[in-house]
C-alpha cells in the first residue's frame, strides 16, 4: 500500500462513490521505482466523524520494477479500519461526543485498546524508520499511518501488534 498526503476526490454519480486521485508523485515502497501503471480500482467504505458512510474508489497501481500491486490510500483512511482517521483520533483523544451516533461503548473500548497496542508497536518500529521520519506513539495518527504503511510495516492483524 502507498499512503498519500496530497490527493483529491471526484464523485461519480453512476458509481455512487468518489474516485481518489493522488496529487503527489508515487513510487514503489519496495523497490523505490516510480514506474507505476494504473491497474484498476477497489471500493472502500468508511464511516466519517458525523456518521455518514463514505464510499471511496481506491486506485490500484502495478510497479513495473518489482511486479507488486499497491493500493494508493489517502491519509484519511486507516488501513483495515472501518472509521476514518478523524473519527479514530476523536475516540483516542477521549472525545466520544464527536464520534458518530450509534458508536457504542464496546466499539470505543475496542478502538482505544487497538491504539494502546499500536503505541507499543510504534515504539518498537520507530527505530527502523527513523531515517525516513520521526514518529513516536504521541505522533498524529496521519503521520504514523503514512510512515508505517509506506515502509510496509503496517500491522494487518492484532497478533502482529502483540508479537515480539
Where are these regions (language model features)?
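Short, conserved DNA-binding cores of transcription-related domains
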Residues: 1-76
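Short, positively charged, Gly/Tyr-enriched micro-motifs
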Residues: 67-163
Amino acid at each position: 500500500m502507498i499512503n498519500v498526503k496530497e490527493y483529491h476526490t471526484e464523485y461519480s454519480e453512476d458509481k455512487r462513490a468518489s474516485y481518489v486521485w493522488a496529487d503527489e508523485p508515487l513510487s514503489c515502497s519496495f523497490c523505490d521505482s516510480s514506474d507505476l501503471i494504473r491497474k484498476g480500482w477497489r471500493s472502500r467504505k468508511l464511516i466519517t466523524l458525523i456518521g455518514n458512510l463514505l464510499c471511496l474508489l481506491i486506485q490500484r497501481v502495478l510497479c513495473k520494477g518489482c511486479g507488486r500491486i499497491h493500493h494508493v490510500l489517502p491519509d484519511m483512511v486507516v488501513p483495515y479500519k472501518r472509521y476514518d482517521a478523524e473519527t479514530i483520533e476523536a475516540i483516542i483523544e477521549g472525545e466520544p461526543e464527536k464520534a458518530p451516533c450509534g458508536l457504542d461503548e464496546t466499539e470505543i473500548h475496542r478502538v482505544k485498546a487497538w491504539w494502546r497496542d499500536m503505541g507499543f508497536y510504534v515504539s518498537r518500529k520507530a527505530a527502523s524508520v527513523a531515517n525516513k521520519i520521526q514518529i513516536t506513539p504521541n505522533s498524529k495518527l496521519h503521520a504514523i499511518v503514512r510512515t508505517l504503511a509506506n515502509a510496509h510495516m503496517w500491522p494487518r492483524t492484532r497478533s502482529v501488534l502483540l508479537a515480539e
